[in-house]
Amino acid sequence: MKNILVVTGGCGFVGSNLIQYLLDKTNYKIISLDDYSSGSKKNQINNSRVKYIKGHTKDIGTILKRNIKKINSLFHFGEFARIYQSFLQMDRCIQSNTIGTNAIFNFCLKNKIKLIYSATSASLGNRGNDRNLSPYAFTKAKNLELLENLKKWFDFKY
């Protein structure tokens, strides 16, 4: 039975609020995967249905290996999400938003797990012309482009 939902970035603002919502509205067990680079342990919700794992999205296949068959859906919020800082920490932005997110996409595609991906106005704003304004916006735009291609190539549903 697929009774687990995964939330990457589960200790950030959006992820922690989503976890609370899922606890209130569903009976699923929840796994939060967060590297705590911007999320906080203060955002953890004390509930027996939630398991918090410290780790990077690039390692998702190894980290969740034992739970693959039980995962229903994955909500991906665990990306580097700071526009200004993406200029100062471009390597970290690319590691998270390109390498980590690619691992998430492949994990979901390979294991037929539903993906809910969070886009951003930084890459969608101004009719998509803002995608080259920062490393952050660029990586998010490329991820959306990759998702569209995965949909065409493999009928990947997200």
Predicted regions and their residues:
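N-terminal Rossmann-like NAD(P)+-binding domain of SDR-like oxidoreductases, especially those catalyzing
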Residues: 1-158
